[in-house]
């Protein structure tokens, strides 16, 4: 417990002193105001707590898997159908929690397209298994935006052990999600979140890599498709090689349709067959060296 920092509450009375495990997520100023991580608070006496109003809008849905396709070697796009007549009233940048029952998953049963199987064979990942004897709950950001109604779309990276030590346990939730097939039933709850865009005209700079694509896509689609925003928006995305890039046509289309939007990709390990002439290296360095370093007022941007 205490690792994700998502269960913040404000304790107005009781609860004892803040624990060292909470200080990575809570500043001294926030602690003075009573901010705590709920999972770290021992309830020994009566307490008075204050919760965000949005918590009371949280619901559960039993969804059905529409598709679960690879978008990159180690990233799947899980698309879930919300029950008819229902909707998840989330904001761009929000997340849901997904439940995994006890399970025994064999990686050899995963549906992996041929173009991605080389790395899986090379690292011996098809020999892995995930055995979990209790329910697991994890949080994932939505990749869809609010007007893509009736669905929940997630980008899920498989959490394998390091190739040099495959005896370590696999990721409980990612293993379960990667095993899902069309028609399977999945329980989610939500919506949750605090990573929301501010209602200003400030320039927006989005930076992410890998499965961090999900909230970026949600935010950018929401700004340009739903809000028709005229804010200056740039997206800086990092991938290992050209094969690991996804949603390329979507973002190319947005750039063509919106003169206020540009996007850039940097590859950290481009392959010879990529014939890559774009940026190389890690995306945060590329962003700084090629844009923010010479920006007139980077502190005024919304990141």
Curated annotation (Swiss-Prot):
Catalytic activity line of the entry: a ubiquinone + n Na(+)(in) + NADH + H(+) = a ubiquinol + n Na(+)(out) + NAD(+)
Listed Gene3D superfamilies: 3.10.20.30, Nucleotide-binding domain of ferredoxin-NADP reductase (FNR) module, Translation factors
This protein's record includes keyword Iron: yes
Cellular compartments annotated: Cell inner membrane
GO molecular function, one term: 2 iron, 2 sulfur cluster binding
Enzyme Commission number(s): 7.2.1.1
Cofactor: [2Fe-2S] cluster; FAD
This protein's UniProt keywords: 2Fe-2S, Cell inner membrane, Cell membrane, FAD, Flavoprotein, Ion transport, Iron, Iron-sulfur, Membrane, Metal-binding, NAD, Sodium, Sodium transport, Translocase, Transport, Ubiquinone
Ranges where the 2Fe-2S ferredoxin-type domain occurs: 1-55
Residues that, per the record, bind [2Fe-2S] cluster: 4, 7, 39
Gene Ontology biological-process annotations: sodium ion transport
Boundaries of every FAD-binding FR-type domain copy: 58-198
UniProt region (Catalytic), positions on chain: 201-303
Top-level class of the enzyme under EC nomenclature: translocase
Name the UniProt record assigns to this protein: Na(+)-translocating NADH-quinone reductase subunit F
UniProt source species: Pseudoalteromonas haloplanktis
Lineage of producing organism: Bacteria, Pseudomonadati, Pseudomonadota, Gammaproteobacteria, Alteromonadales
């Amino acid at each position: 417990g205490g690792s994700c920092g998502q269960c913040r509450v404000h304790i107005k009375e009781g609860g004892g002193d803040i624990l060292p495990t909470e200080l990575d997520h809570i500043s001294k100023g926030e602690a003075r105001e009573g901010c705590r991580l709920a999972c770290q608070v021992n309830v020994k006496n009566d307490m008075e707590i204050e919760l965000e109003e949005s918590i009371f809008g949280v619901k559960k849905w039993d969804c059905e898997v529409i598709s679960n396709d690879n978008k990159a070697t180690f990233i799947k796009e899980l698309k879930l159908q919300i029950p008819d007549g229902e909707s998840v009233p989330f904001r761009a940048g929000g997340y849901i929690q997904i439940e995994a029952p006890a399970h025994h998953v064999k990686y050899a049963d995963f549906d992996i397209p041929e173009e991605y199987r080389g790395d899986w064979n090379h690292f011996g990942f098809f020999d892995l298994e995930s055995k979990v004897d209790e329910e697991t709950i994890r949080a994932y950001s939505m990749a869809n935006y609010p007007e893509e109604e009736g669905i929940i779309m997630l980008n899920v990276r498989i959490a394998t052990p390091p190739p040099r030590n495959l005896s370590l346990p696999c990721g409980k939730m990612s293993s379960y999600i990667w095993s899902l097939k069309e028609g399977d039933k999945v329980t989610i709850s939500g919506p949750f979140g605090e990573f929301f865009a501010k209602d200003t005209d400030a320039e927006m700079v989005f930076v992410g890599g890998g499965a961090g694509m999900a909230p970026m896509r949600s935010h950018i689609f929401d700004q340009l498709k739903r809000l028709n925003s005229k804010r200056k928006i740039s997206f800086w995305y990092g991938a290992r090689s050209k094969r690991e890039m996804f949603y390329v046509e979507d973002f190319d289309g947005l750039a063509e349709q919106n003169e206020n939007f540009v996007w850039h990709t940097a590859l950290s390990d481009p392959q010879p067959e990529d014939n890559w002439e774009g940026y190389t290296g890690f995306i945060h360095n590329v962003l700084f060296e090629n844009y923010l370093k010479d920006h007139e007022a980077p502190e005024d941007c919304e990141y």
